[in-house]
Amino acid sequence: LNQKTHDFLATLAPLALSGIGEGVAAIVGSDLEAAVERLLPALPPAARLVIVDQTADGAQACRRFVQTDLRLGVINETPAQFIEDMVEQRFDALLVMPGCEGDEQALVSLLWQGGFMALHPDLKAPSVDPDELLSWDTGRGVALRMLPPKPRRRGGRRRNQPRQAAA
């Protein structure tokens, strides 16, 4: 692992995983075995992690984790195939690693509201609507947070406002 990857896996990636409770996270990229090994201690006990490795060797190497940890699953697909397959699925956290070049923008669509995406510093940050996503560059990668929808005002009398006297 290079220094950038090391820093990302020590800071932003575990932060993305730590808050998901019983949710589902995905790590997407190539040759992910070393990264997954570093991140497993940060995965909450009731959470699940989908490992999406587009290299056959990387996916095979990650399968050894699945034998001992039932929270994990491995998919051997490219990021584009994964996005297509996951049309109905949303994730609480996405860890986007090298191997996803060109798919960064499309992966945003897989986040739940409130979901957290951690983007490796070698990748291009997606352009986002600030009303829908918070985005900040930490220097060790980019963090994206999907915002909940704005509350809609419903009709009816506003509380704390005096009624107009009936004429």
For each feature predicted by the language model, list its residue ranges:
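Conserved alpha-helix/loop element of class I SAM-dependent methyltransferases that forms part
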Residues: N2-V24, A34-R38
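A short acidic, Gly/Pro-enriched loop at the edge of an enzyme's catalytic core
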Residues: I83-L94
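A short SAM/SAH-binding and catalytic strip from SAM-dependent methyltransferases
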Residues: D92-E104
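Class I SAM-dependent methyltransferase SAM/SAH-binding core
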Residues: V36-G73, A80
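Core SAM-dependent methyltransferase catalytic element
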Residues: D131-A167
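A short glycine-rich, Lys/Arg-flanked "PGG" loop and its adjoining helix->strand segment in the class I
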Residues: D103-F116
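Short glycine-centered segments of the SAM/dcSAM-binding site in methyltransferase folds
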Residues: V24, R48, G114-M117
